[in-house]
Amino acid sequence: MLTKRALRTTDPYRRVLSRGFSVLNRPSPNYPGHVPLTTLERGALAVGSAIGSLINPRRADLIAALGEATATPYFIYRLRDVMLSDPTGRRILRNQPSINSQTLSVEYLRSLSPNTVGRTYVDWLDREGVGPDTRAKVQYIDDKECAYVMQRYRECHDFYHAITGLPVVVEGEIALKTFEFANTLLPMTGLSMFAVMRLKPEEKERFWKLHLPWAVRNGLASKAVINVYWEEQLERDVDELRKELGIEKPVDLREIRKIMRRQKKMAEEAAKTKKRY
């Protein structure tokens, strides 16, 4: 059941209209780092960041800006309500935990058994060469609680990577974003699929044949991953958690890419040998 506080904020259109302003009378920030935007500014941010991230899918700052600009006035409120409708989601909203190197001990995670959630997470971080402190702070979402929901989504993103095994290469990111879109309906995750146009022919073929069917099937069928209290799952068996959430582990993309590179190299060497004789 939604709380009175939730009911007062459920209608995003009424809230946005009641906060109308111009660049000449910009209101005070609602939380540290908040930047209130006019409708025109938000639209410009959405278009600019969408074009920029399509040109360079590795620009995490542009992808973050696109996520915030397109999440309001409806989608982030919907995701917040998904959390409010779930006991664990409500606890997350109440406690507002953060995932970073200050709250998660990497040494502790490395000491866990190999098939635990925490060990799977830190092994994925080590393999991909990333850390838990790379997520930008939310700036452009007006509602403080909804800003936290977006921040939580960002900080949990690497856990989604870890339990699926998908790498941070563009091909892996698109596959995971497609899963996230089916599961969260955040527009930025859906728009990320346009980056398929920048993939190599063999990568495009893998996306349409392997990643897209897996992402849609699992994103729609699995439980809302935003409601997972990852900090409380670290010592659990990762296969058990996948089963509970209803997530099938996809094919090992890193291994597929490695095999393809090896086959390509062998074909090139064979061609050189044939020319020589």
From Swiss-Prot:
- Protein name per UniProt: Ubiquinone biosynthesis protein COQ4, mitochondrial
Tell me the function of this protein: Lyase that catalyzes the C1-decarboxylation of 4-hydroxy-3-methoxy-5-(all-trans-polyprenyl)benzoic acid into 2-methoxy-6-(all-trans-polyprenyl)phenol during ubiquinone biosynthesis.
Q: Where does Zn(2+) bind?
A: H157, D158, H161, E173
Keyword annotations for this protein, in alphabetical order, are: Lyase, Membrane, Metal-binding, Mitochondrion, Mitochondrion inner membrane, Transit peptide, Ubiquinone biosynthesis, Zinc
What is a single Pfam family found in this protein's UniProt entry? Coq4
Q: Which GO terms describe its cellular component?
A: extrinsic component of mitochondrial inner membrane
Q: What does the entry give for GO biological process?
A: ubiquinone biosynthetic process
What is the reaction catalyzed? a 4-hydroxy-3-methoxy-5-(all-trans-polyprenyl)benzoate + H(+) = a 2-methoxy-6-(all-trans-polyprenyl)phenol + CO2
Gene from which this protein is expressed? COQ4
Its subcellular locations are: Mitochondrion inner membrane
Tell me what topology the record assigns in the membrane. Answer: Peripheral membrane protein
Q: In which pathway does it act?
A: Cofactor biosynthesis; ubiquinone biosynthesis
**Highest taxon in the source lineage:** Eukaryota
**Could you describe the subunit structure of this protein?**
Component of a multi-subunit COQ enzyme complex, composed of at least COQ3, COQ4, COQ5, COQ6, COQ7 and COQ9.
Q: What is its EC number?
A: 4.1.1.130
Protein family: Belongs to the COQ4 family.
The cofactor(s) it depends on are: Zn(2+)
Q: Please name the PANTHER family in this protein's record.
A: UBIQUINONE BIOSYNTHESIS PROTEIN, UBIQUINONE BIOSYNTHESIS PROTEIN COQ4 HOMOLOG, MITOCHONDRIAL
Residues of the transit peptide: 1-14
